[in-house]
């Protein structure tokens, strides 16, 4: 296999990706247990993260390492703003602030944006490709777990300007391989991608619910699924 940036990032972050999926909050989320209070805190934290990423990408959009992967259709700030308006109301900015882990994450993005812009590639790759890859599944889980009846609250997962996720991801990976980088720079970007995963994990860990709360929600979730299955069975009998 050719040692391209896209391949190096995929292979070099496999362990970090697995670790991130095993953080308690993420495992609960994937299992269909989503606490609305924790979820809206996550949305708020992601708002600050994406504001930082998108500010630095814009500032460095003509940098040789950023220009090939600068796609404004990926921007999440506006969609996160819609979600925050849904959960907190029109004055949502008065109610949110970055958590301690989020502040560290945001500071990291601004620091490399000013000093080593090529490392922004790692953060863009980690967040945006992750959002595109699992977004629709996570959206379905979130809507079902929080019993969201209308279309609000999960705009973050909607990429309205991207018609074909798979085609776009292929385009993005091809763009990664167009970036003029030395072998050392490629390894630095892979290392930064692992740092990005760690920063995300720290942010998720702050959102962990208590064990009792998780167990209670799991039981409630199981009961709801059983009731739905029971009703479906009765309907078939009738």
Swiss-Prot record:
<keyword id="KW-0349">Heme</keyword>
<protein>
    <recommendedName>
        <fullName>Heme oxygenase</fullName>
        <ecNumber>1.14.14.18</ecNumber>
    </recommendedName>
</protein>
<dbReference type="InterPro" id="IPR002051">
    <property type="entry name" value="Haem_Oase"/>
</dbReference>
<dbReference type="GO" id="GO:0009507">
    <property type="term" value="C:chloroplast"/>
</dbReference>
<comment type="function">
    <text>Catalyzes the opening of the heme ring with the release of iron. Key enzyme in the synthesis of the chromophoric part of the photosynthetic antennae.</text>
</comment>
<dbReference type="InterPro" id="IPR018207">
    <property type="entry name" value="Haem_oxygenase_CS"/>
</dbReference>
<feature type="binding site" description="axial binding residue">
    <location>
        <position position="17"/>
    </location>
    <ligand>
        <name>heme b</name>
    </ligand>
</feature>
<dbReference type="GO" id="GO:0042167">
    <property type="term" value="P:heme catabolic process"/>
</dbReference>
<keyword id="KW-0934">Plastid</keyword>
<keyword id="KW-0150">Chloroplast</keyword>
<dbReference type="GO" id="GO:0020037">
    <property type="term" value="F:heme binding"/>
</dbReference>
<keyword id="KW-0408">Iron</keyword>
<keyword id="KW-0560">Oxidoreductase</keyword>
<comment type="similarity">
    <text>Belongs to the heme oxygenase family.</text>
</comment>
<dbReference type="GO" id="GO:0006979">
    <property type="term" value="P:response to oxidative stress"/>
</dbReference>
<dbReference type="GO" id="GO:0015979">
    <property type="term" value="P:photosynthesis"/>
</dbReference>
<keyword id="KW-0602">Photosynthesis</keyword>
<dbReference type="InterPro" id="IPR016053">
    <property type="entry name" value="Haem_Oase-like"/>
</dbReference>
<dbReference type="GO" id="GO:0046872">
    <property type="term" value="F:metal ion binding"/>
</dbReference>
<keyword id="KW-0479">Metal-binding</keyword>
<dbReference type="GO" id="GO:0006788">
    <property type="term" value="P:heme oxidation"/>
</dbReference>
<dbReference type="InterPro" id="IPR016084">
    <property type="entry name" value="Haem_Oase-like_multi-hlx"/>
</dbReference>
<dbReference type="Pfam" id="PF01126">
    <property type="entry name" value="Heme_oxygenase"/>
</dbReference>
<dbReference type="GO" id="GO:0004392">
    <property type="term" value="F:heme oxygenase (decyclizing) activity"/>
</dbReference>
